[in-house]
């Protein structure tokens, strides 16, 4: 799981700020829930107690920064010995991470024939064999699961249906982080998505490949998004995320889903004449995923910001969700089974009453935009409404 931390600092002193790949250990031990809390004296309002506590805090800070050098020589030698053992552990952990990455690459090659067969069935290039069908039915019986809504409403006929329509779009919409990126306009284009694949590079990193059938939105047959890890490992000898690169989408005329057309009125200050112009402004779309945020360079520290860090972390997490969730278990996301397993904690959202003052304040707010008027994007491929706000930018 990606850590909720700053991920764009590459300097050695800040390596711990970068997230680690989803399937690597975080390097921290589990909390000891059985441990007793430290006993702290009750703080009264008297100055005497406050001064005593202040003195204890000062001694702790002193021990943290300088106390080791003041310990007896024999104790310092033992600490040096522990550091030597820690170095041996770190070397082994570094070797483990490298071998784990190579193991992932090796098994990716073994998974490839399975995913290829899945792609053939989804796009309608081939039908599943009797053996494949029997194994799937046997797995359903072993799990003794209740039928999903899609299974309980089987439709008659459908013999002319090719493959599994909107397989990947449906699966993606069942993954929370991915569904939040998809706008109503995006669905028309994503319905032409026939496969999503992952491949590994020689250098640490992975590539996502999105294959599309011919469609009225863009000319690309395959769109890729590549995630790169840093060459040098972090303090825990795990791979650290560096940056991502995506393909440019070659949009067909008037079909760009990442922009919308806005009609604006302009007035000449001298002649007082007005004219109407149309400009394109960015809008939310899943396809912004292929134009990832760029981490600032090491020299450009001024461009660092919490907002950029959040965008970088979100972009990396989305890539991990494709890699670790959607691609390995696509059919379970399509049927909704994986979504049920995600809700393992048994908690559900509760209805919370809003503060009356907040509700009244919100109802009294007015939004005025006399200068701009959203116009129909006039996409030749569809006539859906403008997208709702989503996280991916």
UniProtKB/Swiss-Prot annotation:
GO terms for cellular component: chromatin; cytosol; nucleus. The keyword Phosphoprotein applies. The modification Phosphothreonine is found at residues 20, 24. GO terms for biological process: nucleosome assembly; nucleosome disassembly; transcription elongation-coupled chromatin remodeling; transcription initiation-coupled chromatin remodeling. Residues 1-38, 122-164, 288-307, 346-393 are annotated as: Disordered. Residues 21-31, 382-393 have a biased composition (Polar residues). It is found in: Nucleus. Keywords: Nucleus, Phosphoprotein. Its main location: nucleus. SUPFAM superfamilies: NAP-like. Residues 297-307, 348-360, 366-375 have a biased composition (Acidic residues). The modification Phosphoserine is found at residues 16, 26, 59, 90. Pfam families: NAP (PF00956). One of its GO terms (molecular function) is chromatin binding. Residues 122-163 have a biased composition (Basic and acidic residues). PANTHER family: TESTIS-SPECIFIC Y-ENCODED PROTEIN. Belongs to the nucleosome assembly protein (NAP) family. This is Putative nucleosome assembly protein C364.06. The lineage of its organism: Eukaryota, Fungi, Dikarya, Ascomycota, Taphrinomycotina.
């Amino acid at each position: 799981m990606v850590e909720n931390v700053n991920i764009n600092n590459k300097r050695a002193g800040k390596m711990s700020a970068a997230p680690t790949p989803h399937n690597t250990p975080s390097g921290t031990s589990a909390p000891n829930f059985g441990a007793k809390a430290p006993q702290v004296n009750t703080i009264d309002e008297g100055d005497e107690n406050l001064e005593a506590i202040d003195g204890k805090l000062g001694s702790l800070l002193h021990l943290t920064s300088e106390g080791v050098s003041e310990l007896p020589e024999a104790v310092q030698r033992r600490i040096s010995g522990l550091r030597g053992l820690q170095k041996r552990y770190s070397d082994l952990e570094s070797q483990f991470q490298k071998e784990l990455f190579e193991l992932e690459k090796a098994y990716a090659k073994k998974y490839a024939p399975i995913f290829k067969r899945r792609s053939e069935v989804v796009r309608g290039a081939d039908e599943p064999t009797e053996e494949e069908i029997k194994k799937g039915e046997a797995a359903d019986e072993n799990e003794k699961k209740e039928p999903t809504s899609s299974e309980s409403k089987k439709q008659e006929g459908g013999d002319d249906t090719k493959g599994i329509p909107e397989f990947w779009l449906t699966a993606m919409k069942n993954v929370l982080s991915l569904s939040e990126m998809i706008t109503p306009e995006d669905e028309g284009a994503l319905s032409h998505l026939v496969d999503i694949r992952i491949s590994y590079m020689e250098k640490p990193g992975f590539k996502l490949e999105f294959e599309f059938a011919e469609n009225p939105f863009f000319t690309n047959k395959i769109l890729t998004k590549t995630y790169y890890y840093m060459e040098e490992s972090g303090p825990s000898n795990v791979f650290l995320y560096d940056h991502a690169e995506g393909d440019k989408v070659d949009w067909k005329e008037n079909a760009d889903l990442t922009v919308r057309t806005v009609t604006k009125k302009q007035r000449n200050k001298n002649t007082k004449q007005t004219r109407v112009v149309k400009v394109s402004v960015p809008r939310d779309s899943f396809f912004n995923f292929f134009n990832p945020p760029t981490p600032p360079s090491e020299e450009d520290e001024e461009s660092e910001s919490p907002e950029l860090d959040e965008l970088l972390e979100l972009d990396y997490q989305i890539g991990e969700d494709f890699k670790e969730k959607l691609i390995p278990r696509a059919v379970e996301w399509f049927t909704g089974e994986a979504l049920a397993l995600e809700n393992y904690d048994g908690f559900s959202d509760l209805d919370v009453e809003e503060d009356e003052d907040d509700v009244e304040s919100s109802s009294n707010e007015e939004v005025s935009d006399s200068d701009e008027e959203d116009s129909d994007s006039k996409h030749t491929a569809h006539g859906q409404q403008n997208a709702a706000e989503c996280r991916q930018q």
